[in-house]
């Protein structure tokens, strides 16, 4: 993830996007949702979203229209004028996802996008992510929820101690593990340890 964000230079190998060498400054529009969330918590929800929309090249009117529509979609329409620090952690996370997908980025990097959500809100957010995928966005995300992998992903890499323990299409990984489910594969690789799984 850090290489995709331009924070690290890869020691070897290549980063390709649509078959071309990938550079952060290469014109690919990017949306990033970090695991550690961070927005301007003393500002109102609508002001924060409009501000980030303008940073992403949207007009103020476009950013406001998108923000209000999105807040309605995630059941936060009544929070538009509330300061972010008055929202729950889950509500703030919904706002941050909205900021991440503003202006339809070509590449979405999501680090634990549904962490801490109940099943209802997890499904809601995964519906939104799936819509971005269907609209043509490339999505790279870290998750420990194998049902999300089964639903959304074409390829996966499971890392342990910095080494890839499984990589390929979902079908090829299952075949490698004798047809096991992704849940069973995760348990086999990580046992009782917390693992890191990156999917696209």
Functional labels for PLM-detected ranges:
Residues 149-151:
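A short, surface-exposed alpha-helical micro-motif characterized by mixed small hydrophobic
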Residues 50, 54, 61-79:
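Conserved ABC ATPase "signature" region
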Residues 167-168:
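ABC ATPase "signature
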Residues 5:
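Helix-to-loop junction immediately C-terminal to a conserved catalytic motif
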Residues 108-112:
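Catalytic Walker B motif of ABC-type/P-loop ATPase nucleotide-binding domains
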Residues 13-28:
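Conserved ABC transporter NBD signature motif
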